[in-house]
From Swiss-Prot:
Superkingdom as given in the UniProt entry: Eukaryota
PANTHER family: CENTROCORTIN FAMILY MEMBER (PTHR19232), CEREBELLAR DEGENERATION-RELATED PROTEIN 2 (PTHR19232:SF1)
Coiled coil, from the record: 38-142, 178-268, 348-376
Family: Belongs to the CDR2 family.
Cellular component terms per the entry's GO annotation: cytoplasm
Species this protein is from: Gallus gallus (Chicken)
Protein name: Cerebellar degeneration-related protein 2
Keyword Transferase: no
Keywords for the protein's UniProt record, in alphabetical order: Coiled coil
The UniProt record lists the keyword RNA-binding: no
Name of the gene: CDR2
Amino acid sequence: MLADSLVEEFEIREDEPWYDQQDLQQDLHLAAELGKTLLDRNTELEESLQQMYATNQEQLQEIEYLTKQVELLRQMNDQHAKVYEQLDVTARELEDTNQKLVAESRASQQKILSLTETIENLQTHVDDLQRQVEELKKSGRGRMNHERSDQPRSMHSFSCLKELYDLRQYFVYDHVFAEKITSMDSQLNPLEEENENLKKAVTVLQAQLTLEKEKRVTMEEEYSLVVKENCDLEQRLVDIDLYRARAEELEVEVAEMRQMLQSENTIHSAEKLVPESFFISFKESLERELGQSPADDGLLTVPELDKKALKRSSSENFLSSAAGGDILRGHEETCIRRAEAVKQRGISVLNEVDAQYNALKVKYEELLKKCQIDEDSLKHKAVQTLKQYSKDSVGNTQYDLSANNQEFTNAGELLSSTNTLPEYKALFKEIFSCIKKTKEEIDEHRSKYKSLSSQP
């Protein structure tokens, strides 16, 4: 456009007459230089424009790249948000599990406390029973064993009490640890640190769970063993009570027999019994008289008996009398003599029975002491098995308990055999049967004598 304007000016100036040729050349030269400079400037502007286009495209590419990076960052942020949500969920679950574990630890601690209380109650019960056994042992020994010193009752404690208290301490520590875990800061740490902390917490909790399960299993095994041993001890104590009741029954029977003997002795001394041999001889003489006179239908009078002879119990001489008065006087004299003999004989029988009773009583006390010694030894063995109990020697303790049970059953069989066949009982039975027979025979002879004497 500048060149066209210059050409027009040049044409106008040619028309004018005052236009100089030199000036025209100079103007042309200047115009050429100006056009050249303008062309250079135009090329520079075009190059700068192209550079601007290139930079613009580069910036557009950078913008696209940055938008892609922003999208990737948004995706990463979303993923991180999801991970944070999952971590929050896992943290809540872990807190819930921690609370459950704390509750379970408290429940197990309460259970252990209740078990310790029951064990202590059982221990006190066993101690009371041991005291009763020792008191019975002391009362049973009596005057025979004053020289022997009573063995002091050893206080036996269960070996598992220490482990129970240790477990209580461990459970308290677990409870504190769980409270520390639940009271952790809720601030969001970096992902790696949080993951590592959570993994460590999970491993610690799993280890504590395994330890608690193992301790619970061991405690249940120990509790079952203690329950079995306590059941065995209670059964033995029941057997001891049965033996004691049996012994009291035997003592009551002996006292009743003694009272019966005393009552029989008082009755015999009051009635002044005639010896059995006299009445037997009198019975034989009466039967002989009745056999010789069958035509009279067994009716005899006292004068008819005056002609017969009576046999004495002390000798085999015959007594002949002529009158009924002589017979009666002789009969009274013999009754008096026989009453004195019966008194002496009853005293001697009582002395013999008393001696036999004392011997049987001594024998019975010895058997009772022997049974009590066996029971005490079994009781001490059973309690020592509790003290010597350990996890590695469960089989040995069971073997000892079975051996103790066998010894206890043997002792019970021995005591039952002694209770089923007592010798003094048979002796007293024979004595009472003899006394009853003699009494019946005496009553029969007396009734016959009264019937004969009452006849006219």
